Protein backbone atom coordinates (compact mmCIF):
# COMPACT_ATOMS: atom_id res chain seq x y z
CA UNK A 1 0.00 0.00 0.00
CA UNK A 2 2.84 2.39 0.90
CA UNK A 3 4.62 1.54 -2.36
CA UNK A 4 1.46 2.33 -4.35
CA UNK A 5 1.03 5.67 -2.56
CA UNK A 6 4.68 6.64 -3.18
CA UNK A 7 4.37 5.68 -6.85
CA UNK A 8 1.25 7.85 -7.20
CA UNK A 9 3.05 10.81 -5.57
CA UNK A 10 6.03 10.30 -7.85
CA UNK A 11 3.73 10.22 -10.87
CA UNK A 12 2.28 13.60 -9.86
CA UNK A 13 5.80 15.07 -9.46
CA UNK A 14 6.71 13.77 -12.93
CA UNK A 15 3.51 15.34 -14.30
CA UNK A 16 4.42 18.72 -12.81
CA UNK A 17 7.86 18.56 -14.46
CA UNK A 18 6.34 17.63 -17.82
CA UNK A 19 3.62 20.30 -17.56
CA UNK A 20 6.17 23.03 -16.74
CA UNK A 21 8.50 21.89 -19.55
CA UNK A 22 5.86 21.77 -22.28
CA UNK A 23 3.87 24.83 -21.19
CA UNK A 24 7.03 26.93 -20.94
CA UNK A 25 8.31 25.74 -24.32
CA UNK A 26 4.92 26.56 -25.83
CA UNK A 27 5.07 30.01 -24.22
CA UNK A 28 8.20 30.88 -26.19
CA UNK A 29 6.41 29.96 -29.42
CA UNK A 30 3.32 31.81 -28.23
CA UNK A 31 5.27 35.00 -27.51
CA UNK A 32 7.42 34.96 -30.65
CA UNK A 33 4.94 33.64 -33.24
CA UNK A 34 1.32 33.72 -32.05
CA UNK A 35 1.59 37.01 -30.09
CA UNK A 36 -1.73 37.02 -28.17
CA UNK A 37 -2.88 40.24 -26.52
CA UNK A 38 -2.55 38.63 -23.06
CA UNK A 39 -1.77 35.34 -21.35
CA UNK A 40 -4.97 33.72 -20.09
CA UNK A 41 -5.72 30.28 -18.66
CA UNK A 42 -6.90 29.18 -22.10
CA UNK A 43 -3.64 30.38 -23.68
CA UNK A 44 -1.60 28.47 -21.08
CA UNK A 45 -3.45 25.24 -21.84
CA UNK A 46 -2.85 25.82 -25.57
CA UNK A 47 0.84 26.35 -24.81
CA UNK A 48 1.09 22.90 -23.24
CA UNK A 49 0.00 21.20 -26.47
CA UNK A 50 2.18 23.49 -28.57
CA UNK A 51 5.11 22.63 -26.30
CA UNK A 52 4.38 18.92 -26.74
CA UNK A 53 4.46 19.32 -30.53
CA UNK A 54 7.71 21.34 -30.48
CA UNK A 55 9.32 18.83 -28.10
CA UNK A 56 8.45 15.97 -30.46
CA UNK A 57 10.13 17.85 -33.33
CA UNK A 58 13.21 18.49 -31.17
CA UNK A 59 13.43 14.82 -30.10
CA UNK A 60 13.37 13.66 -33.73
CA UNK A 61 16.20 16.04 -34.65
CA UNK A 62 18.15 15.08 -31.53
CA UNK A 63 17.77 11.37 -32.31
CA UNK A 64 19.56 11.75 -35.64
CA UNK A 65 22.81 12.30 -33.70
CA UNK A 66 22.28 11.12 -30.12
CA UNK A 67 20.32 8.65 -28.06
CA UNK A 68 17.34 10.03 -26.13
CA UNK A 69 19.25 10.70 -22.92
CA UNK A 70 19.17 12.93 -19.85
CA UNK A 71 20.64 15.84 -21.86
CA UNK A 72 17.61 15.89 -24.18
CA UNK A 73 15.32 16.00 -21.14
CA UNK A 74 17.43 18.77 -19.58
CA UNK A 75 17.21 20.99 -22.68
CA UNK A 76 13.41 20.73 -22.82
CA UNK A 77 13.11 21.28 -19.07
CA UNK A 78 15.45 24.30 -19.21
CA UNK A 79 13.44 25.79 -22.07
CA UNK A 80 10.21 25.38 -20.11
CA UNK A 81 11.47 26.66 -16.77
CA UNK A 82 13.16 29.71 -18.31
CA UNK A 83 9.91 30.72 -20.03
CA UNK A 84 7.90 30.26 -16.84
CA UNK A 85 10.36 32.46 -14.92
CA UNK A 86 10.43 35.13 -17.65
CA UNK A 87 6.61 35.33 -17.70
CA UNK A 88 6.00 34.67 -14.00
CA UNK A 89 3.84 37.75 -13.30
CA UNK A 90 1.54 37.17 -16.28
CA UNK A 91 1.23 33.46 -15.50
CA UNK A 92 0.40 34.16 -11.85
CA UNK A 93 -2.32 36.60 -12.89
CA UNK A 94 -3.76 34.07 -15.36
CA UNK A 95 -3.97 31.10 -12.98
CA UNK A 96 -5.22 33.02 -9.92
CA UNK A 97 -8.92 32.38 -9.41
CA UNK A 98 -10.14 35.92 -8.71
CA UNK A 99 -12.77 36.41 -7.51
CA UNK A 100 -12.90 32.88 -6.08
CA UNK A 101 -16.39 31.47 -6.61
CA UNK A 102 -18.22 28.36 -5.47
CA UNK A 103 -18.03 26.87 -8.97
CA UNK A 104 -14.22 27.03 -8.78
CA UNK A 105 -14.36 24.82 -5.69
CA UNK A 106 -16.43 22.25 -7.60
CA UNK A 107 -13.97 22.32 -10.50
CA UNK A 108 -10.93 21.89 -8.23
CA UNK A 109 -12.62 19.03 -6.35
CA UNK A 110 -13.55 17.32 -9.65
CA UNK A 111 -10.03 17.80 -10.97
CA UNK A 112 -8.41 16.27 -7.87
CA UNK A 113 -10.78 13.31 -8.16
CA UNK A 114 -9.64 12.72 -11.75
CA UNK A 115 -5.98 13.12 -10.75
CA UNK A 116 -6.36 10.35 -8.17
CA UNK A 117 -8.36 8.23 -10.62
CA UNK A 118 -5.76 8.47 -13.39
CA UNK A 119 -2.74 8.00 -11.08
CA UNK A 120 -4.33 4.85 -9.73
CA UNK A 121 -5.19 3.58 -13.21
CA UNK A 122 -1.69 4.00 -14.66
CA UNK A 123 -0.32 1.73 -11.93
CA UNK A 124 -2.23 -1.21 -13.42
CA UNK A 125 -0.54 -4.22 -14.99
CA UNK A 126 0.80 -3.72 -18.51
CA UNK A 127 -1.16 -5.83 -20.99
CA UNK A 128 0.16 -7.84 -23.93
CA UNK A 129 0.97 -7.00 -27.54
CA UNK A 130 -0.29 -3.71 -29.07
CA UNK A 131 -1.73 -2.44 -25.78
CA UNK A 132 1.35 -3.01 -23.67
CA UNK A 133 4.73 -4.69 -24.12
CA UNK A 134 4.74 -4.13 -27.87
CA UNK A 135 6.43 -0.72 -27.55
CA UNK A 136 8.87 -1.37 -24.70
CA UNK A 137 11.76 -2.69 -26.87
CA UNK A 138 11.38 0.32 -29.20
CA UNK A 139 11.67 2.72 -26.26
CA UNK A 140 14.80 0.96 -25.02
CA UNK A 141 16.49 1.11 -28.44
CA UNK A 142 15.81 4.86 -28.62
CA UNK A 143 17.23 5.36 -25.12
CA UNK A 144 20.45 3.50 -25.87
CA UNK A 145 21.26 4.52 -29.46
CA UNK A 146 20.68 7.28 -32.02
CA UNK A 147 18.59 6.35 -35.04
CA UNK A 148 19.90 3.07 -36.50
CA UNK A 149 19.68 2.58 -40.29
CA UNK A 150 17.59 -0.46 -41.15
CA UNK A 151 16.58 -1.26 -37.56
CA UNK A 152 13.23 -2.44 -38.90
CA UNK A 153 14.99 -5.41 -40.52
CA UNK A 154 15.71 -6.75 -37.03
CA UNK A 155 12.04 -6.71 -36.08
CA UNK A 156 9.17 -5.19 -38.07
CA UNK A 157 7.78 -3.08 -35.23
CA UNK A 158 11.12 -1.22 -34.90
CA UNK A 159 10.43 0.43 -38.26
CA UNK A 160 7.08 1.88 -37.17
CA UNK A 161 7.82 5.58 -37.29
CA UNK A 162 5.69 6.88 -34.42
CA UNK A 163 7.08 9.76 -32.35
CA UNK A 164 5.35 8.87 -29.03
CA UNK A 165 8.11 6.30 -28.49
CA UNK A 166 10.66 9.15 -28.51
CA UNK A 167 8.49 10.96 -25.96
CA UNK A 168 8.32 7.86 -23.74
CA UNK A 169 12.08 7.32 -24.07
CA UNK A 170 12.63 10.91 -22.92
CA UNK A 171 10.46 10.34 -19.84
CA UNK A 172 12.38 7.19 -18.94
CA UNK A 173 15.32 9.50 -18.18
CA UNK A 174 13.45 11.45 -15.50
CA UNK A 175 14.83 10.15 -12.16
CA UNK A 176 12.01 7.85 -11.14
CA UNK A 177 11.08 4.22 -10.65
CA UNK A 178 7.87 4.94 -12.58
CA UNK A 179 8.09 3.82 -16.24
CA UNK A 180 8.03 6.83 -18.55
CA UNK A 181 5.14 5.69 -20.71
CA UNK A 182 2.87 5.59 -17.66
CA UNK A 183 3.73 9.17 -16.70
CA UNK A 184 3.38 10.26 -20.34
CA UNK A 185 -0.09 8.82 -20.84
CA UNK A 186 -1.31 10.21 -17.52
CA UNK A 187 -0.23 13.83 -17.99
CA UNK A 188 -1.90 14.15 -21.40
CA UNK A 189 -5.21 12.89 -20.02
CA UNK A 190 -5.00 15.06 -16.88
CA UNK A 191 -4.17 18.29 -18.75
CA UNK A 192 -7.03 17.76 -21.18
CA UNK A 193 -9.49 17.09 -18.35
CA UNK A 194 -8.31 20.27 -16.58
CA UNK A 195 -8.65 22.27 -19.80
CA UNK A 196 -12.23 21.13 -20.33
CA UNK A 197 -13.25 21.80 -16.71
CA UNK A 198 -11.71 25.28 -16.52
CA UNK A 199 -12.96 26.31 -19.96
CA UNK A 200 -16.49 25.50 -18.87
CA UNK A 201 -16.03 27.72 -15.80
CA UNK A 202 -14.41 30.58 -17.72
CA UNK A 203 -16.92 30.68 -20.61
CA UNK A 204 -19.67 33.29 -20.68
CA UNK A 205 -23.18 31.94 -20.24
CA UNK A 206 -24.90 32.31 -23.62
CA UNK A 207 -26.09 30.08 -26.47
CA UNK A 208 -22.51 29.26 -27.45
CA UNK A 209 -21.81 28.34 -23.82
CA UNK A 210 -24.68 25.83 -23.79
CA UNK A 211 -23.46 24.19 -27.00
CA UNK A 212 -19.92 24.20 -25.64
CA UNK A 213 -21.06 22.60 -22.38
CA UNK A 214 -22.79 19.76 -24.23
CA UNK A 215 -19.84 19.22 -26.59
CA UNK A 216 -17.24 19.30 -23.82
CA UNK A 217 -19.39 17.03 -21.67
CA UNK A 218 -19.19 14.46 -24.48
CA UNK A 219 -15.41 14.93 -24.69
CA UNK A 220 -15.07 14.62 -20.92
CA UNK A 221 -17.07 11.38 -20.92
CA UNK A 222 -14.79 9.96 -23.61
CA UNK A 223 -11.72 11.00 -21.61
CA UNK A 224 -13.01 9.33 -18.44
CA UNK A 225 -13.48 6.10 -20.38
CA UNK A 226 -10.02 6.61 -21.90
CA UNK A 227 -8.39 7.12 -18.49
CA UNK A 228 -9.82 3.78 -17.35
CA UNK A 229 -9.30 1.97 -20.66
CA UNK A 230 -6.67 -0.25 -22.24
CA UNK A 231 -4.25 2.48 -23.23
CA UNK A 232 -3.87 4.35 -19.92
CA UNK A 233 -0.85 2.27 -18.86
CA UNK A 234 0.35 1.06 -22.26
CA UNK A 235 3.51 1.83 -24.22
CA UNK A 236 1.68 2.64 -27.45
CA UNK A 237 0.72 5.82 -29.37
CA UNK A 238 -3.06 5.53 -29.00
CA UNK A 239 -3.45 7.61 -25.84
CA UNK A 240 -1.47 10.54 -27.27
CA UNK A 241 -3.39 10.20 -30.53
CA UNK A 242 -6.76 10.34 -28.76
CA UNK A 243 -5.81 13.28 -26.50
CA UNK A 244 -4.40 15.41 -29.31
CA UNK A 245 -7.40 14.59 -31.53
CA UNK A 246 -9.78 15.73 -28.79
CA UNK A 247 -7.82 18.95 -28.30
CA UNK A 248 -8.04 19.68 -32.04
CA UNK A 249 -11.79 19.01 -31.96
CA UNK A 250 -12.04 21.44 -29.06
CA UNK A 251 -10.19 24.21 -30.99
CA UNK A 252 -12.25 23.67 -34.16
CA UNK A 253 -15.47 23.82 -32.12
CA UNK A 254 -14.23 27.03 -30.49
CA UNK A 255 -13.55 28.49 -33.92
CA UNK A 256 -16.96 27.60 -35.34
CA UNK A 257 -19.23 28.36 -32.38
CA UNK A 258 -17.61 31.24 -30.48
CA UNK A 259 -16.94 33.41 -33.58
CA UNK A 260 -13.62 34.94 -32.46
CA UNK A 261 -12.12 38.01 -34.16
CA UNK A 262 -9.83 37.62 -37.18
CA UNK A 263 -6.62 37.83 -35.14
CA UNK A 264 -7.79 35.03 -32.84
CA UNK A 265 -8.97 32.96 -35.83
CA UNK A 266 -5.48 33.19 -37.33
CA UNK A 267 -3.92 32.23 -33.98
CA UNK A 268 -6.19 29.16 -33.79
CA UNK A 269 -5.30 28.27 -37.39
CA UNK A 270 -1.57 28.32 -36.55
CA UNK A 271 -2.17 26.06 -33.54
CA UNK A 272 -4.39 23.66 -35.51
CA UNK A 273 -1.96 23.40 -38.44
CA UNK A 274 1.04 22.72 -36.18
CA UNK A 275 -0.73 20.12 -34.05
CA UNK A 276 -2.44 18.47 -37.05
CA UNK A 277 0.97 17.87 -38.61
CA UNK A 278 2.17 16.43 -35.29
CA UNK A 279 -0.90 14.17 -35.22
CA UNK A 280 0.22 12.58 -38.50
CA UNK A 281 3.67 11.86 -37.02
CA UNK A 282 1.99 10.14 -34.06
CA UNK A 283 0.02 7.80 -36.32
CA UNK A 284 -0.29 8.18 -40.06
CA UNK A 285 -3.84 6.79 -40.02
CA UNK A 286 -4.89 10.15 -38.51
CA UNK A 287 -3.93 12.00 -41.72
CA UNK A 288 -7.50 12.44 -43.02
CA UNK A 289 -8.72 13.84 -39.70
CA UNK A 290 -5.71 16.19 -39.57
CA UNK A 291 -6.34 17.46 -43.12
CA UNK A 292 -10.03 18.10 -42.33
CA UNK A 293 -9.04 20.11 -39.23
CA UNK A 294 -6.57 22.27 -41.20
CA UNK A 295 -9.01 22.90 -44.07
CA UNK A 296 -11.80 23.84 -41.63
CA UNK A 297 -9.54 26.28 -39.77
CA UNK A 298 -8.30 27.78 -43.06
CA UNK A 299 -11.81 28.13 -44.51
CA UNK A 300 -12.84 30.28 -41.54
CA UNK A 301 -10.13 32.83 -42.29
CA UNK A 302 -10.73 35.82 -44.55
CA UNK A 303 -8.74 38.09 -46.88
CA UNK A 304 -5.13 38.72 -45.90
CA UNK A 305 -5.20 36.05 -43.20
CA UNK A 306 -5.81 33.34 -45.83
CA UNK A 307 -2.75 34.43 -47.80
CA UNK A 308 -0.60 34.49 -44.66
CA UNK A 309 -1.90 31.06 -43.68
CA UNK A 310 -0.69 29.49 -46.95
CA UNK A 311 2.81 30.87 -46.32
CA UNK A 312 2.79 29.58 -42.73
CA UNK A 313 1.79 26.10 -43.95
CA UNK A 314 4.63 26.06 -46.49
CA UNK A 315 7.08 26.90 -43.70
CA UNK A 316 5.74 24.92 -40.75
CA UNK A 317 4.55 21.66 -42.31
CA UNK A 318 8.04 20.74 -43.62
CA UNK A 319 9.46 21.63 -40.18
CA UNK A 320 7.27 18.91 -38.64
CA UNK A 321 6.99 16.35 -41.43
CA UNK A 322 10.46 16.28 -43.05
CA UNK A 323 12.34 15.10 -39.90
CA UNK A 324 9.62 12.48 -39.37
CA UNK A 325 9.87 11.19 -42.97
CA UNK A 326 13.69 11.07 -42.88
CA UNK A 327 13.60 9.34 -39.49
CA UNK A 328 11.23 6.72 -40.90
CA UNK A 329 13.33 6.10 -44.01
CA UNK A 330 16.46 5.58 -41.89
CA UNK A 331 14.71 3.25 -39.43
CA UNK A 332 13.12 1.06 -42.09
CA UNK A 333 15.96 1.18 -44.60
CA UNK A 334 13.42 1.75 -47.40
CA UNK A 335 11.93 4.83 -49.05
CA UNK A 336 8.49 3.34 -48.48
CA UNK A 337 7.71 0.97 -45.62
Where are these regions (language model features)?
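Specific aromatic-rich, kink-prone transmembrane helix
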Residues: 21-22, 26-29, 240-260, 268, ...
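Membrane-interface alpha helices of multi-pass inner-membrane proteins
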Residues: 60-63, 268-284, 288-295, 333
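Membrane-lumen/periplasm interface segments of specific transmembrane helices
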Residues: 123-126, 167, 311-337
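Multi-pass, polyprenyl lipid-linked donor-dependent membrane glycosyltransferases
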Residues: 184-188, 208, 215, 227-254
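Perimembrane helix-loop-helix junctions
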Residues: 83-85, 89-91, 102, 289-318
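Membrane-embedded, hydrophobic transmembrane alpha-helices
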Residues: 1-98
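Membrane-interfacial entry segments at the cytosolic side of transmembrane helices
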Residues: 68-74, 96-108, 208-212, 264-267, ...
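Active-site lumenal/periplasmic loops and adjacent helix-entry segments of GT-C-fold
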Residues: 116-213, 232-234
Amino acid sequence: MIELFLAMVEAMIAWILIAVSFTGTGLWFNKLVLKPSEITRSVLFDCFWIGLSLSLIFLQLWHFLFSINIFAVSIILLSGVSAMIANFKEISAAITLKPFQKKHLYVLASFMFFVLLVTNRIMGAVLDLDTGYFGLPIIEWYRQYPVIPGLGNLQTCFAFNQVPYLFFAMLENIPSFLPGFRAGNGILTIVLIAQILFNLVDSKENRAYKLKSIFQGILLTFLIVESLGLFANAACPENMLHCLSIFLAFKIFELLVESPDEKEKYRIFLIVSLLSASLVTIKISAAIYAIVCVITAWYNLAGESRKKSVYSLLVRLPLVLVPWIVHGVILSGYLLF
